[in-house]
Swiss-Prot record:
Heterodimer of LeuC and LeuD. InterPro entries: 3-IsopropMal_deHydase_ssu, Aconitase/3IPM_dehydase_swvl, AconitaseA/IPMdHydase_ssu_swvl, IPMI_Swivel, LeuD. One of its GO terms (molecular function) is 3-isopropylmalate dehydratase activity. It comes from the Bacteria. Its EC number is 4.2.1.33. Pathway: Amino-acid biosynthesis; L-leucine biosynthesis; L-leucine from 3-methyl-2-oxobutanoate: step 2/4. The keyword Amino-acid biosynthesis applies. It catalyses: (2R,3S)-3-isopropylmalate = (2S)-2-isopropylmalate. Catalyzes the isomerization between 2-isopropylmalate and 3-isopropylmalate, via the formation of 2-isopropylmaleate. GO terms for cellular component: 3-isopropylmalate dehydratase complex. Keywords: Amino-acid biosynthesis, Branched-chain amino acid biosynthesis, Leucine biosynthesis, Lyase. This is 3-isopropylmalate dehydratase small subunit. HAMAP family: LeuD_type1.
Amino acid sequence: MTGFKQHTGLVVPLDTANIDTDAIIPKQFLQKVTRTGFGQHLFNDWRFLDDAGQQENPDFIMNAPRYQGASILLARENFGCGSSREHAPWALADYGIQVMIAPSFADIFYGNSINNQMVPVRLTDQEVDELFQYVETNEGAEITVDLETMQVTANGKTYSFEIDEFRRHCLLNGLDNIGLTLQHADKIAEYEAKIPAFLV
């Protein structure tokens, strides 16, 4: 996995609180076991007027031409609540989202996002309000997120955020749970070599 250090991208503002994982990726699309192919169904019930996902809903903000290609999602509090399905961050990542900014995230969703190399940034309600105003009134508005300095830059202003040091280390170095384990492959092999054969 490639590490995340800094990203500048177009922002799509999703001005809704308590968006749950069922809305992010509806249950009928969860049959796959690979991480790809979920992006086309992201917010399926909101993005499309038909079950087949062919007729776009012109009133849903992510379908607006000005937000096509967005890689940063701006949302309200408690984003990613509901069931613990990891398919939700898979769908966001497959769609092209690299950063999510909100006042708060559901705990399991927050951890799953980091495990999938997406950066969930928590800012205050007031700071998020300022970003919504900036993005909605400036077509093509971009935001820069710097994980090394833990700062968000937008419209000439800088906002600080926090991510605990261990998770920040994983994001910066592109490490998921498997990657972390493989860092200790030599020690694991050494330990396994000492295990009596009858225990293997």
